[in-house]
């Protein structure tokens, strides 16, 4: 079984040979010679017994020594002639016929001249060019040689076959047109014969159709056989190419053996011939690298590289297991079935993958939608919980026959009657002389009256009546509840609430009189005119008890409540302070947070403000209360009295408690801020009013407590005013924009410069004495200089202090520049005071006087020195201190002269 060849359609001139092919299976019945000339290549057909070996070697030697004919890749224009033997002819059916035998003999003796522009095989003859697409690996002439396989020749098959007396003379496959054409022609005599035998036209058409189908089937069989023959031909051509390479190499080796001395090829050249092409080509190239000329060497190298690549590709592509190719007649059907199965499986996998991905996407979308639905449901439930629920009374069945059920005014005012009322704040009962018939318009007025009664109830729950001093303790302990909120925003002794209640009663009387005289329309049962039975607003945010407790503690401890409200007793009852500050909405929100834990200062809406807090702020607005002039004058007088009392008491206590030193530099600044604090305290205490006649003692205690707290606040502010914190300074951008930013100029610190000293080699002394490294010697050596440096530093530090502290740090009569201190007093143990020091006048060197108790001196510019000190300045300094000089002389007597440098 001959392995088939898988071909691919190349982009340019060239062909690709497939699977492995053993070199031992190659036969030499055909010799393929390559030439670069324009003439037709000559391929000699070997005889039955084959040519002589000498002739072969001579021919190969002649061809191989031609440098341009081996491995040439420059020329693309050449012609190739294939002389096919009998085993490569097309095996067509009906081999026993005379026509087939003649054609077979003609094919065996015919030379096919194939040029580069020759037409290719028809589409039906090409071997599945779409199955594989491999990159082109063949170089030059070999690629062109193998590329002409699929461009062989126009196949003309002529066959005559008689079927039921009808002759189909010709079945033409024309490769020039690239299409399959079937020419069915019949002789007139045959047609007349058929028409004579066939009785009807329908039978003639049926017979013609059957014959046409048979012809097409036969044509398909022929095409399949042609494909198989083409694959066999390709395999033979691959064998010829491999054999050609072997012959070229053998001829070259024999040529080198005959022409060169035998010493060069001591490494068994026959082994090189029998080995694989890779080893042979590498051995040849390494063995002949020194003997060949440059041109021949490059040609051999190119030839070896091309042959190596071609054989690698042949060995790779001719593997029947990898390619699935076979020369069996059923190979096409099996390959088609396998390809169909592979395609079906691939399509099924792709569809399954697509469906799976789509299913996953749908699942994710469904889960996302479910999450959104759940989120919207929760949000809807929260909105419904937060939304107030309105309950209206049931409308009457007959608007004009049956009266609506209305709660009695006494029932609505029962809660207000239970609360203690002022004698002037009595609420008169509604008029009883009005007509109560259903057609009367007074029912609408009664509804208005009941709504006003409810407002009266709310206001009465917020007001504090004037009680006796005996009842004041009970009222202070009692905590009222209004609208579900604890009322802790008021105390008992506020006269403006009673005045406000009296004015509201008068207004209700006026409105009632006007409404009784006005004409009303008939009563209807719409929701707009139906009485409101209940209103309940749920809070969306509910805070825990721990947060409310912490919030209350923070509110009382925060600086906001230091001026608005302060706790007066253990029950956290507080008093309104400043009316101007209470009108701010954020303060109302803070008070609402204190009164009700459900109210949040940020998250809650303004309309969720507790009603008692909102109504408690209304009486403090003087421009909203339009009362009698007498009441306002009296109230203003009481306010003036309380304000004067508070300001006087606070000012006396403040002056007695704090009296700054008049000699301090910040005296004027503190006095200015004290006047400002007094004005602020007077403004804060302006809102505090207490009834002088009823609760004078409690008012005095409260004023004393408030004044003490104000004094403490003023002290803290004055104490913090002396310290400047850069982080707490706030400058408006309007002041910064037109100004230019100035950079701080830092003064450079003058450091002593270093002097380069030429190092001289020290002569080793005759008698080396050990140096005294004890602590006492070190201290005695350096104590004097340390004291001098301390004196200099302290005087420099005093001179660099700010200007505002110079008057306090120095005395009035002396200046820091006029003080001269001597180092002798600071160094000698007999010096007790600065006055006992005597300045020394030696050598123009200015000495310093230093005292640890009163460092008020200023240094005069001293001489610049270079450290370490040399011998002369050291001796000069030692001479200025007698005691140290004596010690140094004693040391110098004990040690050599060179040891003095260490001092």
UniProtKB/Swiss-Prot annotation:
InterPro entries tied to this protein: NSL1, PEHE_dom
Region of interest (Disordered), residue spans: 319-343, 419-441, 652-676
Residue spans of biased composition, Polar residues class: 423-441, 652-661
Pfam families the record matches: PEHE (PF15275)
Coiled coil (UniProt feature): none
Domain of life: Eukaryota
GO cellular component, one term: intracellular membrane-bounded organelle
Residue span(s) of domain PEHE: 748-862
PANTHER family: KAT8 REGULATORY NSL COMPLEX SUBUNIT 1-LIKE PROTEIN (PTHR22443:SF16), NON-SPECIFIC LETHAL 1, ISOFORM M (PTHR22443)
Record protein name field: KAT8 regulatory NSL complex subunit 1-like protein
Organism in which the protein naturally occurs: Xenopus tropicalis (Western clawed frog)
Gene it is expressed from: kansl1l
């Amino acid at each position: 079984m001959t392995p088939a060849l898988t071909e691919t359609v190349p982009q340019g001139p060239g062909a690709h040979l497939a699977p492995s092919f053993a070199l031992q299976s190659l036969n030499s019945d055909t010799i393929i010679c390559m030439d670069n000339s324009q003439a037709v290549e000559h391929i000699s057909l070997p005889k039955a017994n084959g040519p002589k070996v000498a002739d072969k070697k001579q021919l190969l030697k002649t061809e191989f020594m031609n440098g341009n004919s081996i491995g040439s890749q420059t020329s693309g224009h050449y012609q190739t002639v294939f002389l096919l033997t009998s085993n490569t002819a097309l095996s067509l059916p009906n081999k026993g016929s005379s026509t087939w035998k003649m054609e077979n003999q003609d094919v065996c003796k015919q030379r096919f001249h194939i040029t580069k522009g020759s037409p290719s095989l028809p589409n039906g003859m090409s071997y599945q060019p779409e199955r594989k697409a491999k990159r082109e690996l063949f170089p030059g002439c070999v690629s062109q040689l193998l590329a002409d396989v699929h461009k062989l020749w126009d196949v003309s098959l002529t066959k005559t076959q008689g079927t039921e007396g009808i002759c189909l003379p010709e079945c033409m496959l024309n490769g020039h047109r690239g299409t399959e054409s079937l020419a069915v022609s019949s002789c007139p005599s045959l047609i007349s014969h058929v028409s004579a035998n066939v009785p009807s036209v329908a039978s003639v058409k049926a017979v013609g159709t059957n014959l046409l189908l048979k012809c097409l089937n036969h044509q398909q069989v022929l095409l399949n056989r042609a494909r198989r023959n083409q694959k066999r031909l390709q395999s033979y051509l691959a064998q010829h190419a491999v054999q050609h390479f072997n012959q070229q190499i053998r001829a070259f080796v024999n040529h080198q053996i005959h022409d060169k001395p035998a010493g060069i090829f001591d490494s068994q050249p026959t082994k090189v011939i029998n080995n694989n092409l890779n080893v042979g080509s590498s051995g040849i190239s390494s063995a002949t690298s020194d003997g060949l000329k440059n041109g021949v060497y490059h040609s051999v190298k190119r030839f070896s590289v091309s042959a190596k690549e071609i054989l690698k590709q042949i060995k790779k592509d001719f593997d029947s297991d990898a390619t699935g190719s076979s020369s069996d007649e059923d190979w096409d059907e099996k390959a088609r079935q396998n390809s169909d199965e592979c395609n079906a499986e691939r399509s099924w996998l792709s569809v399954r993958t697509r469906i799976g991905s789509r299913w996953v996407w749908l699942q994710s979308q469904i889960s996302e939608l479910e999450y959104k639905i759940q989120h919207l449901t929760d949000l809807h439930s929260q909105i419904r919980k937060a939304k107030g629920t309105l309950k209206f009374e049931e409308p009457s069945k007959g608007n004009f026959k049956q009266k609506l059920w209305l709660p009695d005014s006494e029932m609505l005012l029962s809660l207000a009657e239970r609360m203690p009322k002022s004698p002037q704040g009595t609420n008169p009962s509604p008029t009883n002389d009005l007509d109560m018939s259903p057609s009367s318009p007074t029912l609408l007025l009664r509804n208005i009256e009941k709504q006003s009664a409810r407002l009266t109830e709310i206001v009465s729950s917020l007001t504090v009546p004037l009680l006796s001093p005996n009842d004041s303790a009970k009222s202070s302990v009692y905590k009222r509840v209004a609208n579900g909120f604890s009322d802790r925003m008021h105390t008992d002794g506020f006269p403006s609430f009673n005045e406000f209640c009296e004015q509201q009663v008068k207004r209700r009387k006026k409105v009632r009189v006007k409404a009784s005289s006005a004409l009303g329309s008939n009563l209807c049962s719409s929701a707009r005119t139906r009485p409101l039975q209940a209103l309940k607003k749920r809070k969306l945010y509910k805070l825990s008890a721990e947060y409310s407790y912490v919030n209350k503690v923070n509110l009382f401890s925060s600086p906001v409540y230091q001026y608005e409200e302060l706790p007066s007793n253990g029950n956290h009852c507080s008093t309104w302070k400043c009316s101007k500050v209470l009108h701010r909405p954020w303060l109302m929100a803070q008070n609402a947070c204190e009164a009700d834990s459900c109210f949040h200062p940020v998250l809650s809406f303004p309309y969720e403000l507790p009603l008692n807090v909102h109504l408690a702020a209304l009486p403090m607005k003087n421009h909203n209360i339009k009362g009698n002039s007498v009441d306002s004058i009296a109230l203003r007088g009481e306010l003036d009295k309380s304000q004067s009392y508070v300001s006087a008491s606070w000012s006396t206590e403040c002056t007695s408690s704090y009296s700054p030193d008049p000699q301090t530099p910040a005296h004027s600044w503190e006095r200015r801020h004290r006047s400002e604090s007094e004005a602020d305290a007077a403004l804060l205490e302006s809102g505090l009013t207490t009834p002088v006649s009823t609760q004078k003692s409690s008012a005095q205690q409260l004023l004393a407590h408030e004044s003490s707290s104000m004094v403490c606040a003023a002290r803290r502010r004055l104490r913090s005013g002396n310290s400047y914190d850069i982080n707490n300074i706030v400058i408006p951008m309007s002041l910064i924009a037109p100004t230019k930013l100035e950079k701080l100029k830092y003064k450079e610190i003058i450091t002593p410069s270093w002097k380069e000293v030429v190092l001289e080699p020290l002569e080793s002394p005759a008698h080396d004495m050990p140096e005294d490294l004890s602590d006492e010697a070190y201290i005695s050596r350096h104590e004097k200089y340390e004291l001098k440096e301390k004196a200099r530093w302290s005087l420099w530090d005093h001179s660099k202090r700010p200007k505002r502290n110079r008057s306090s740090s120095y005395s009035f009569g002396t200046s820091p520049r006029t003080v001269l201190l001597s180092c002798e007093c600071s160094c000698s143990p007999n010096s007790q005071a600065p006055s006992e020091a005597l300045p020394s006048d030696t050598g123009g060197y200015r000495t310093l006087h230093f005292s640890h108790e009163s460092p008020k001196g200023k240094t005069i510019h001293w001489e610049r020195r270079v450290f370490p000190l040399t011998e002369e300045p050291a001796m000069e300094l030692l001479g200025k201190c007698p005691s140290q000089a004596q010690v140094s002389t004693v040391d110098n007597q004990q040690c050599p002269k060179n040891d003095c440098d260490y001092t």
